[in-house]
Amino acid sequence: MDGPRGLGVTASDFGLEGPRGWAFRGVGVDAGPGSLIAVAGPSGSGRTCLLLALTGRMRSTEGTATVGGATLPRQMAAARRASALAHVPGVTDLDPALTVGEHLLERALLQRRFGGSLKDSLRGPLRPRAERAAEGKLRIDSALAAAGLDREALPKGSRTAVRDLERLEALRLSVALALVGRPGLLGVDDTDLKLSDAERAEVWALLKSIAQSGTTVVAVCGEAPDGAVRVSTRPTHHTSETDDKETADALAETGRS
């Protein structure tokens, strides 16, 4: 299986205005493939909206941006196909009643059915079942290793319910699920929310490792770590409630995938 190929990200005077005002504006980015990009700013400053816009899930209204070979907003679908999201409230929520193994199996099945090219989708049912199962296992094992999640270390292994995971374990699982599709760009929201200093350090070490392996990472945070490409969102008059409403409206238009 081919390794991930990170996507370069550029933006100039990038902005998004909704019916309630600007979610963000005047954003500039210049990051090469395999970069760790930290979107830093206070809550309510449009950080999540910027993350969703750069991954083709919200439509920008000002300026220009490119993600790999996709120009935004004209080629949002291409940006969506090349990227994946993790730990985004309301978008990638884990089901607390399902186990870790069930989440991973579901994602592998979805990837097999919808994640490849049209040619792969048509060929998939014709491949031997053992071959398909082996590829799915390889994807899962590779994603778990990259996310630093050891199933054997969990209370009940793969049968551990999501509701029983620690906060950091749940974040690692969300990242692993996103990596099953081997995206060129990984977007992670709220990387440092409600985490201790030690846990934050673990998360940044994880995201730096993923970036070093080739996948470009865009991470929303309160404070950017050393060595990251720092992108700031400008505070607006929005409240968090308003920001959440605009995010929901945009996702209803473009889809959550």
Q: Where are the language model's segments positioned?
A:
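Conserved ABC transporter NBD signature motif
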Residues: S60-T71
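ABC-family P-loop ATPase nucleotide-binding domains
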Residues: P89-E169
